[in-house]
């Protein structure tokens, strides 16, 4: 499930036929259910990505501090001795594996914000 696809779905679902408001209002619970299911799915995907981030963060910390298994350094040599905490943090901040997962988490956050905005639209329909 990606943001573009969800936005396209919403663009189609948000169209209201003003000549048939009764039937349109009956669709609201179905749409709410549909987008709440998507919201829950994306939330779980984000949580899985957060879990991945935590595991990879530990692996990369061990890598930069010289505590990773020897075979890791055979596959991906690291020629520096990093001793200071802020130097380790700089390497961690620039690490491709970590930034890739961090971007995934941010993407899920943006998707969830969009879905929250969609849910507010449904709530307004119930107020009228």
Go through the PLM ranges and name each one.
Residues 121-128:
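Conserved small/polar residues in nucleotide/adenosyl-binding loops
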Residues 55-99:
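Extended, amphipathic alpha-helical coiled-coil scaffold segments used for oligomerization/tethering
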Residues 30-63:
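Short, well-structured hydrophobic secondary-structure segments
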Residues 9-37:
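Short, charge-rich amphipathic alpha-helices with coiled-coil/heptad character
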Residues 94-116:
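Amphipathic alpha-helical coiled-coil segments
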Residues 50-51, 115-118:
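Short amphipathic alpha-helical segments with coiled-coil-like heptad repeat character
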Residues 1-9:
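Eukaryotic intrinsically disordered, low-complexity tracts enriched in Ser/Pro/Thr/Gly and charged residues
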């Amino acid at each position: 499930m990606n943001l573009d696809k969800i936005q396209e779905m919403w663009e189609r679902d948000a169209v209201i036929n003003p000549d048939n408001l009764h039937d349109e209002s009956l669709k609201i619970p179905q749409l709410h259910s549909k987008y709440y299911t998507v919201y829950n799915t994306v939330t779980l995907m984000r949580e899985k990505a957060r879990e991945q981030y935590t595991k990879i963060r530990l692996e990369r910390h061990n890598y930069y501090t010289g505590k990773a298994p020897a075979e890791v350094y055979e596959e991906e040599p690291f020629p520096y001795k990093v001793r200071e905490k802020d130097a380790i943090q700089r390497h961690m901040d620039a690490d491709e594996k970590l930034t890739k997962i961090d971007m995934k988490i941010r993407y899920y956050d943006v998707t969830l914000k969009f879905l929250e905005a969609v849910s507010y639209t449904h709530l307004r329909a119930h107020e009228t």
